[in-house]
Amino acid sequence: MIDSRLPLTDIHRHLDGNIRAQTILDLGRQFNLALPADELEALRPHVQITHAEPDLVSFLQKLDWGVAVLGDLEACRRVAYENVEDAANAGLHYAELRFSPYYMAMKHQLPVTGVVEAVIDGIRSGSRDLGIDVRLIGIMSRTFGEAACLQELEGLLAHRDGITALDLAGDELGFPGGLFLNHFNRARDAGLRITVHAGEAAGPESIWQAIRELGAERIGHGVKAVEDPALMDFLAEHGIGIESCLTSNIQTSTVASLAQHPLAKFLRHGVMASINTDDPAVQGIEIEHEYLVAAPQAGLTPAEIRTAQENGLKMAFLSEQEKQTLRDKVRG
């Protein structure tokens, strides 16, 4: 259930993993690009998960068609604006949308800084038009290596006023966090908040590294934390939040079934964990599904689901005053 008296948040939601199938079709036609299908329903299986993928990298390949059609900066702006529309239509009061500017720029060799600017512009326009508070998290896509991540970081820092936090995502096994120490030092010096994808494909040591070496205040996914009792204690004691994405973890085969998902264990151990989507368009789900279907199947009680909803706002990269304003607004 969703408690209508509390703000509904989604703080782990990839903008470039939430490109509508219709938009992929539209932009493919606009830029005369060869798509795997030229009708919406025929295209859908190519851009949306229809069954669990064998691993994270296979899952991520489903995202590639969405960014393949970003033929100019206006297309990036359109996708950003539509992401705000989707968040508002999902009933969210607050969302943190994350994006990898290098990934979005790569196919058509767009300027990384230009992509950042276009996304910020689309988000600001959407927030203004739709009355929803949306913040941006810049991603460094570790899969493309240290130099590409440096390009991303510099593009994000060039528009620091529009970016709230920095993340590291992609191939966690092939590109461990230790490769990016200098990147995160610069980000923290610039005042960016820090969240890191960790403990999704790699083990608890990846989470420890994200916290101790990269300065992570929150962990994306973090499912492997349950394998390390000392880490579970540390997360609970220091208020380091886990951004749980239930359906996503099944679709990437990170977790075998919802019944085995560690979210309930996190909450019962006092770890601050929240419920989020990840890549809604690619997954074919929305936040309501995660609360009404996935969370109960993961063994959460109604009280635990409510706690997870509260945690979403507690974990948000907002000031305490901004959080209280949002609570007051929802209470009406």
Swiss-Prot record:
CDD domains: ADA (cd01320). It comes from the Bacteria. Zn(2+) binds at residues 12, 14, 197, 278. The record marks 221 as: Important for catalytic activity. Substrate binds at residues 14, 16, 170, 279. Its EC number is 3.5.4.4. Keywords: Hydrolase, Metal-binding, Nucleotide metabolism, Zinc. GO terms for biological process: adenosine catabolic process; hypoxanthine salvage; inosine biosynthetic process; nucleotide metabolic process; purine ribonucleoside monophosphate biosynthetic process. One of its GO terms (molecular function) is 2'-deoxyadenosine deaminase activity. Its cofactor is Zn(2+). One of its GO terms (cellular component) is cytosol. The active site is at residue 200. Transmembrane segments: none annotated. Catalyzes the hydrolytic deamination of adenosine and 2-deoxyadenosine. Belongs to the metallo-dependent hydrolases superfamily. Adenosine and AMP deaminases family. Adenosine deaminase subfamily. This is Adenosine deaminase. It comes from Serratia proteamaculans (strain 568). The lineage of its organism: Bacteria, Pseudomonadati, Pseudomonadota, Gammaproteobacteria, Enterobacterales.
